[in-house]
Swiss-Prot record:
It comes from Rickettsia massiliae (strain Mtu5). One of its GO terms (cellular component) is ribosome. This is Large ribosomal subunit protein bL20. GO terms for molecular function: rRNA binding; structural constituent of ribosome. It holds the Pfam family Ribosomal_L20. The gene is rplT. Binds directly to 23S ribosomal RNA and is necessary for the in vitro assembly process of the 50S ribosomal subunit. It is not involved in the protein synthesizing functions of that subunit. Keywords: Ribonucleoprotein, Ribosomal protein, RNA-binding, rRNA-binding. It comes from the Bacteria. Belongs to the bacterial ribosomal protein bL20 family. SUPFAM superfamilies: Ribosomal protein L20 (SSF74731). GO terms for biological process: ribosomal large subunit assembly; translation. PROSITE patterns: RIBOSOMAL_L20. CDD domains: Ribosomal_L20.
Amino acid sequence: MTRVKSGKISKNRHKKILKLAKGYRGRANSCFRVAIEKVEKALQYAYRDRRNRKRDFRGLWIQRINAAVREHELVYSQFMGALKKAGIDINRKVLAELAVNNSDGFVSIVEKAKAHI
């Protein structure tokens, strides 16, 4: 049998990993064996944190809504319950955005919710 060398394939695979490892510290950006471990771990972190980001942002929106609602003598849970009773269907992301950037609009929503407590 003839000898098969995977020069081009191997070189391209190494280049791909080293390109992903660009900016890493120490040998992790230049040594293939170290770089492949670091890139795999980085991809695991990225996968995990894409899911955690959704969790974190929901918590942030709830904190912002709660802080804005407490200025109007309400608590977050009461406010959300009152919104549901009032038939106002706005998600937390939009409510938090209104609370931060459009206080007049948020106040009108709070007043409508207060009427249904």
